[in-house]
UniProtKB/Swiss-Prot annotation:
Belongs to the prokaryotic/mitochondrial release factor family. Peptide chain release factor 1 directs the termination of translation in response to the peptide chain termination codons UAG and UAA. Pfam families: PCRF, RF-1. Signal peptide: none annotated. The modification N5-methylglutamine is found at Q235. The keyword Cell division does not apply. It is found in: Cytoplasm. This is Peptide chain release factor 1. Methylated by PrmC. Methylation increases the termination efficiency of RF1. It comes from Cupriavidus metallidurans (strain ATCC 43123 / DSM 2839 / NBRC 102507 / CH34) (Ralstonia metallidurans). It comes from the Bacteria. The gene is prfA.
Amino acid sequence: MKASISTKLDQLAERLDEVNALLAREDATANMDQYRKLSREHAELSPVAEQYGQYRQAQDDLATAQALLDDPEMKEFAADEIDAARERLQSLENSLQTLLLPKDPNDDRNLLLEIRAGTGGEESALFAADLLRMYTRYAERRRWQVEIMSESPSDLGGYKEVIVRIAGDAAFSRLKFESGGHRVQRVPATESQGRIHTSACTVAVMPEADEVGEVEINPSDLRVDTFRASGAGGQHVNKTDSAVRLTHLPTGIVVECQDDRSQHRNKEKAMKVLAARIKDMQLRAAQAKEANTRRNLIGSGDRSDRIRTYNFPQGRVTDHRINLTLYKIDMIMDGDLDELISALSAEHQADQLAALGEES
């Protein structure tokens, strides 16, 4: 094990002792915020310290076995013990390196998923609806909740733009690599000659701010417009200005919500989307800065990056970031995304491990 990693592990073990002492104090629960913070830190440090303890025990076992090599009667036994200890040490070192990887603080958050039709006109809007169904089915498989926050339907039942909130266990950690350009190649329903068309959508996955107040939005930086919601008319036509448009002047971000009949509810939804977009902008700026100093294969989430192609005639889906092609497009479009997502997560972890090796 590299000296820098060993030093880091010693420091974490010492910190766990300090946290244990603080949690054992009689007045530990006097400040509940501090108590919860220490409890979370304890939960994060304990697995690392436990594995490091096993690693040090394996080091002791190796030293003991090596000392037995000089004894002719114990030589064969000692050689077997040395092989076993070395194998155990390597396995534990790999586990410890993984545990030391930087945690994404947003991994446990809920998220806002935004799908926008791009090149390809009505076919692109129809594909946006297909992508929404794909992610909704995936969410259902994982027992997550999906709520439409804002939608702009197209004439043929697709979406020019749709934003949904997805809430559930580790939702952002599973879907955060979906940001980018999604390209589809297929014969559109509107095509009479049977020609294959190429169109595209962009997907943005944004961690939800725990509270809108988590993202600082100065009221003076906000322009609020209300207007009458558009709809199909009839008896449910909206006769009040319930639709809300928020414009964040410093960034130029504009959010509209008109799906609810309550202006208050529409404004509440719009504020959630606005806060997530501002937070996402801040995250991408930080990631761009990080990418200047080291390779960041998966996590850039640049909207202009074409990340995936869905080729219906060939029945394949290709993720261009990791050169993975799967010939099960129907299953994937029905929400079977785990193989894709797990491969992306594994590549990201390998990228982090390589960076950890460079730093140490």
